[in-house]
Amino acid sequence: MHFALDEDQKALQDAVRSYLRDRFDLEKVRAVYDDPEGDGDPAELWSAVSEQGWLAVLVPEEHDGVGLGLVAASVISRALGAGTVPGPWLGTVLAAEAVRLAGSDAQKASWLPRLAAGEAKGAVALLKPGSSPEPGNAPATSDGGTLSGQLQIVEYAEVADVLVVAAQDGLHLVEPKGAGVTITRCAALDRSTRTSTVDLDGAAGERLESSSDAVVQELLDRAAVLVANDLVGIARRALTDTVEYDKTRVQFGRPVGSFQAIKHHLADLHVAVTMAEHAALYAAHAVEAGLEDAALAVSIAKSKAADTARQAVSDMIQYHGGIGFTWEHHAHFSFKRAKRLEYAYGDATQHRERIARLLIDRAVGGQLGEGGADGGQTTVGGVTAAQGTGVAAGATA
C-alpha cells in the first residue's frame, strides 16, 4: 500500500514549517532556554498557534474546529519537534481529545470551542511516571467526585485553564486553581517545556461522562502517536543539520563528510529515520481509521521513533565535534527533548512488550497462521515486528 500525505496535509506541513522558519527559529527557542524562571509559553507563538488553527486540527467542525484528523495533527507535531518548539500545544490538543472522546454534549460545547481557539490551555496527567501506557496506571484516585494523588511531570500545569486527570474510574476535568490543587514547578533538563508536580487533596473533579478503559487507552495511543511524530521530527532535523555541517567541517585536509565511514553511517541513519517516519505516520492513519492493527502500529511507531531519535541526536553531537558539546550550539536542545519524550506515554521497552503481547494474542487466536513464508513476522507501516519477540526492526522492500 502506498501511503502519503494528501494535498491539504502537505499544505499544512508547508505552512507550519514556513512559520517556524521565519517567525520562531532556534534563537527564539534559545530565549526560552535562557529564561528558566519564565512560563515557557511565548505569547507571540501561542497567538500564531491559535490563529493558524493548529489547536483546532482534531476538534470537529461543529465545535469550531477544523477536524483534519490525527495525520494532520502528526504533521504539526513533527514540525514542532524539528524546531524544538516550546509551549502547551500537545497538552491542549490532548485535553481537547479527551473531551471529544469522552465528554457529554454539554462538556463538549463548553470546552472544545475554547480549546480550539486557544482561549483555554490544557494539561493532562494520564499515567504514573515510568508506568506502561495502560488505563490501570492512572495517577489519581477518585472518591465521591473528588480526586486525590500526586501527579508528576505534568507539562504546563502552571498556565493551564483545565487539567485532564485519569483516575480508576476514567477521565476527570480539574480546575488548576481550585481548592485542593497545589502546583509546584519542577526543574527540567529540557527547557523547551515546563513541568510541575500537581498535588490533589480532595480536589473537585468533573468526570467526563463517557469515560471507559477503552477511551483512556485510545487517548494514550493518540498521545503516543503525537509524541512519536515529534521524535521523528527531532531525528530528521538532527540528521539534516549533521549532514550539512559535515559537508563543510574540514579535518585532515578534506570535509569529514567525504570519509567513507561517516558517509556509510549517515546513510544508515537516513534509512532508520525514514523507517521511523513511515511507522509514525502509518500509526496516525491506523488509529484515525480504526484499523485492526492500530495498537500494534502505535507501539511499533513509538519504540522505533524513540530509538531512532536517540541515535540521531547522539550522532549529531558527535559529528559536530567539539562545538556540538557546547551550550551555545543548539544540538543539546534536540538531545534533551528527545530524552524527555523517549519516556512519554511508554518507553521503547514497554512498547516492545506490548508488541509481543499483541502478536502472541494474534498467534494464539490463529490470526497469524503458522508463520509461513514471512517466517512469523508481521509488517505495519513499513516496519517489521518479529512474532513473539516484540522487536520492531528493519524495513520491508
Model-derived segments and their meaning:
Residues M1-L5, R17-F24, D64-L68, G87, ...:
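Short, exposed beta-strand "edge-strand" segments with a Pro/Gly-rich flavor and a Y/T-containing core
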Residues A106, P113-T240, E244, R362, ...:
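FAD-binding core of flavoproteins
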Residues M1-G83, R114, G118, D221-A397:
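Alpha-helical interface subdomain recognition
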